[in-house]
Amino acid sequence: MLTLSKQTDYALLALTYLSAAGRAANTKEIAEQHDIPIELLAKILQKLTRAGLLTSAPGPTGRYRLARSPGTVTIGEVVKLIDGPPALAQCMRPENAVCGQQEKCTIRAPLAAINARIMLLLDHITLAEIEIGRAHV
């Protein structure tokens, strides 16, 4: 089954925290608010910053803030950034693209279509919708 990693959970928690707060916050504050290991959160926040989702102030007490409006950040964007493209079946992962059953497989195409619909849904749910609890599925 399609499962998001703990890192993606933490990234979404941090992003929604910053969005709801409407201000900059440091790694320690976010980690304490959500009981996230601070070292892991620091790596996730750096990744989000490199991707342009956050801005950061330099220094040991550096603070992070959203770089974009919460209405323009999609859950799909965060999932792909942290976990890579989701896949319902192992054969849909880039590292498993060649499958010995491919010629006889009757489920790959339907699963690929389902996978595409899931990504389409995630690409249309924004951080703003998650924050206010109004994600329409």
Residue ranges and their predicted role:
Residues 2, 6, 10-36, 55, ...:
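N-terminal helix-turn-helix DNA-binding core of bacterial DNA-binding proteins
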Residues 18, 44-49:
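Basic amphipathic alpha-helical segments that dock to polyanions
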Residues 32, 49-50:
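Alpha-helical residues within the helix-turn-helix
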Residues 39:
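Key DNA-contact positions within bacterial/archaeal DNA-binding proteins
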Residues 51-67:
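Beta-hairpin "wing" of winged helix-turn-helix
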Residues 67-134:
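Non-DNA-binding regulatory cores of transcription-related proteins
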